[in-house]
A protein has these predicted regions:
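Membrane-interface helix termini and inter-helical loops of multi-pass transporters
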Residues: 155-159, 229
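Helix-coil boundary and N-terminal low-complexity module in membrane systems
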Residues: 1-151, 161-164, 178-180, 185-226, ...
Length: 283
């Protein structure tokens, strides 16, 4: 039987996390295996979307080769690319709904993790899906539809440059930031969908630059589509999903908790204020 390691000294209050930055690194140090398991679950639910992206890359490469080989004109290639982008964005709606289900379960596990609460992995995963899957699906569908509008309008950029970029701007600077707060709210509070959106706008106004930073990190992931098709590209995507995505979600959960503490928790939800944090002045 494997002998368990024992600490050389008793655990003291000073070793507990005193702010949410310390909570993040404590979770990485002490519960890395749980975080990786969450990443593997996210990868499982993200596989349909990855499959769509691989198909997009292959078809796009075939269009490019046909254009270079003189088998189609530049006008035909542009038409095919526009159709490919539209069909891909429509397929992404279904794929994102599938991913939203898995994310709802994982988000609850990571919430328990940053709160320092006991984790019953599969029980919490199923409970998160039961409680939040519908809300998460609704959020992803709205963002995906804005993306479809962006793809449609991108075909008008040459004729109407400003109009062509409006949906993309709405997605990056309005829909996605508010959606991030709607998702984190839904993991913690019981609140109506319209109220969650209203709250999301208010929270976004409290921390605009932090929120935009997290949004732009998602945009950078989206820009990987511009990279040429290669085994390295998809290997990095798979590894990023398993290791970096759950860390991103955990970091956003902690940022959200800071905002919630500042705006609502101190007065309305004192039991949630500084949850998972052991301030030195509270000793």
């Amino acid at each position: 039987m494997k002998k368990r390691k024992q600490a050389s000294s008793d655990f003291t209050f000073a070793q507990l996390p005193h702010n949410r930055k310390e909570v993040f690194f404590d979770c990485l140090k002490l519960r890395f295996g749980t975080i990786v398991c969450c990443g593997l679950l996210l990868l499982l639910f993200l596989l349909p979307l990855i499959t769509v992206e691989i198909t997009y890359d292959i078809v796009n490469l075939n269009i490019y080769n046909s254009l270079i080989g003189g088998q189609m004109s530049e006008t035909q290639a542009t038409l095919y690319k526009n159709e490919l982008q539209l069909y891909t964005s429509l397929a992404q709606i279904v794929c994102l709904c599938i991913f939203a289900v898995g994310l709802a379960g994982v988000a609850r596990i990571l919430r328990q993790l940053v709160w320092g609460e006991p984790i019953f992995f599969w029980v919490d995963f199923k409970r998160g899906i039961k409680q939040n899957a519908a809300r998460f699906i609704a959020v992803f569908v709205i963002c995906a539809l804005v993306n479809v509008a962006s793809v449609l309008c991108s075909t008008m950029i040459d004729e109407m440059p400003i109009v062509g970029y409006i949906p993309l701007g709405v997605l990056i600077f309005v829909a996605a930031p508010v959606a991030l707060f709607v998702l984190s709210q839904s993991t913690i509070y019981t609140v109506g969908f319209s109220k969650a959106i209203t709250n999301g706008l208010a929270f976004y106004g409290k921390r605009p630059w932090q929120t935009l930073l997290f949004t732009l990190l998602l945009v950078l992931v989206g820009l990987t589509r511009l990279a040429p098709i290669s085994a390295l590209k998809y290997t990095l995507l798979l590894l990023g999903t398993v290791f970096l995505l759950p860390m991103y979600i955990m970091a956003w959960m902690l940022v959200s908790c800071n905002v919630f503490d500042e705006v609502v928790n101190r007065e309305n939800y004192p039991e949630l204020y500084d949850k998972g944090v052991y301030r030195l002045d509270k000793q």
